[in-house]
A protein has these predicted regions:
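Intrinsically disordered, low-complexity regions enriched in serine/threonine
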Residues: 72-255
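A generic structural signal for solvent-exposed, polar alpha-helical segments
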Residues: 35-38, 52, 67, 134, ...
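N-terminal low-complexity, intrinsically disordered segments
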Residues: 1-64, 71
Length: 255
């Protein structure tokens, strides 16, 4: 995958280059623009690979998500066609902190995973003037290293297979996470979550393969839920939380 230029980022997510913030904020508000962070991380070798927002209207302060990867991984992927990433969520409407998380991008399904465990914490930096810009960048670089270190855990997930019942139990928990608002449809939805979209995800019933199949189905949607087709999970906050919970449930299966 190629790095996005600034013009390509603007076309996808103009909020990244928003330099103002909501006038409802107090004088204590300290703004860390997403564009500033991107520029600083580019000097460290990182490039934007994806950017999207919950609102497409230029000039708004809405929440947006940016994923970055080191240039070394843009040319040479991990043997299983994945790469570690920095995931940034930000807004300038005062509704949230600057959020930095570790992620994994899987090329085969163009899907972004978010890692969640004790070692790869969810870093939230408040927008207030007491926090330095350097602390944001240092946190992002630390998260990038944590994403690389997560491959040891991924290798363990690949090495351990699940029984059919364990797969069903994981899918059931995933359905409860994704359809927390619709308990009646969770049972049928759980069965659909285990349907793979590609042959390589069905070779072995490993934790890693099971997790990837379920995660992709939860995020991308397309399954019949009641009388409706489930839509992709585009809400950034919900996407992040579902992703993190699915990861936690998957790693909990490790013996």
């Amino acid at each position: 995958m190629f790095a996005l230029t600034n013009s390509e980022i603007v076309a996808r997510c103009p909020q990244v280059f928003q330099t103002n913030y909501s006038k409802a904020r107090t004088k204590k508000y300290g703004q860390y623009t997403t564009a500033q962070v991107i520029d600083a991380l580019r000097t460290e070798g990182y490039e934007v690979t994806n950017a999207f927002s919950q609102a497409r209207t230029p000039g708004q302060f809405s929440k947006h998500c940016v994923r970055l990867s080191h240039r070394d991984f843009l040319d040479t992927l991990h043997p299983d066609e994945t790469r570690p990433e920095i995931v940034i969520v930000n807004s300038h409407d005062g509704s949230s902190s600057f959020r930095i998380m570790a992620g994994i991008f899987r090329l085969v399904c163009s899907n972004g995973l978010i890692i969640a465990d004790e070692q790869t914490a969810d870093n939230r930096i408040c927008h207030w003037k007491g926090n330095s810009f350097d602390s944001v960048i240092n946190t992002a670089l630390l998260v990038a290293e944590q994403a690389k270190e997560s491959y040891e855990l991924i290798d363990q997930m690949k090495a351990q297979n699940l029984t059919p019942q364990q797969q069903k139990d994981y899918a059931t928990k995933a359905a409860q996470i994704r359809l927390a608002y619709n308990k009646k449809s969770q049972v049928n939805f759980a069965e659909n979550l285990l349907v793979p979209h590609r042959h390589e995800d069905n070779i072995t019933p490993s934790i890693w393969n099971t997790y990837n199949v379920v995660q992709e189905n939860c995020i991308k949607g397309g399954q019949l839920v009641g009388s409706r087709v489930l839509r992709p999970l585009t809400n950034i906050s919900q996407n992040v939380e579902v992703n993190r919970k699915l990861w936690n449930e998957a790693t909990a299966l490790l013996a």
